[in-house]
């Protein structure tokens, strides 16, 4: 994948960059693997805003992704590499030998015609899924489970990867994209390789309207609000807020640790660095 730039025909075009989509091989998804997706506008079932700055955006169809990789010992051939509007990574359509079709996240260097498999005896090559106990130390992995059989939850965004650092008892130590080293059960599955579309982080949105297409609404600074709306609001003329930075609910922010202890805390070997 490469980044496409534009001639500065307008202020919005000047800073805008875009993916070339050269790895995409199909323009329409597999109909049996898509669902309707209803937008929430950041509201919960009571109609109250639980996620600010969310709303609008282009209509999307949700692609059903196989995060469990539970179809074991059956090889599958990569039929297409496709765009997915619901995530930053590309997706790959697999045709299994028994006729079933499934989508997976497309790893870097996976091509149409390649064969992948989910198996304990699978080769260590991009796209193959194995339990962590069957993966050699130092291997680059993604799409990692936290609970056995629940489906992958870690390292799923474009360009991300984790690394298997050690094995001890029934746990493997995995270094995550944040720098955190975490213990994960050996029987949890992971996929070999790095998630594709690595240049996604280099794409420049370029203009406010393009963010609106993605369903992102404007983020208003607290100092620009009234006192009724934010602790930093109010004051005569332009002010700095007059206090240490806080959230709209008065909780310190910008470096203040807010993570509470959880049942999973003992499994963190090293805290994140980012």
Swiss-Prot record:
SUPFAM superfamilies: Nucleic acid-binding proteins (SSF50249), Translation proteins SH3-like domain (SSF50104)
This protein's record includes keyword RNA-binding: yes
Span list, region Disordered: 224-259
Function noted in UniProt: One of the primary rRNA binding proteins. Required for association of the 30S and 50S subunits to form the 70S ribosome, for tRNA binding and peptide bond formation. It has been suggested to have peptidyltransferase activity; this is somewhat controversial. Makes several contacts with the 16S rRNA in the 70S ribosome.
UniProt keywords, alphabetically: Ribonucleoprotein, Ribosomal protein, RNA-binding, rRNA-binding
One GO location term (cellular component): large ribosomal subunit
Pfam family, one: Ribosomal_L2_C
UniProt organism field: Geobacter sp. (strain M21)
GO molecular function per UniProt: rRNA binding; structural constituent of ribosome; transferase activity
Family indicated by similarity: Belongs to the universal ribosomal protein uL2 family.
Quaternary structure and interacting proteins, as annotated: Part of the 50S ribosomal subunit. Forms a bridge to the 30S subunit in the 70S ribosome.
Protein name: Large ribosomal subunit protein uL2
PANTHER family: LARGE RIBOSOMAL SUBUNIT PROTEIN UL2M, RIBOSOMAL PROTEIN L2
Lineage per the UniProt record: Bacteria, Pseudomonadati, Thermodesulfobacteriota, Desulfuromonadia, Geobacterales
Gene Ontology BP terms: cytoplasmic translation
InterPro entries: NA-bd_OB-fold, Rib_uL2_dom2, Ribosomal_uL2, Ribosomal_uL2_bac/org-type, Ribosomal_uL2_C, Ribosomal_uL2_CS, Ribosomal_uL2_dom3, Ribosomal_uL2_RNA-bd_dom
UniProt cross-references to PROSITE patterns, sorted A to Z: RIBOSOMAL_L2
Keyword Repressor: no
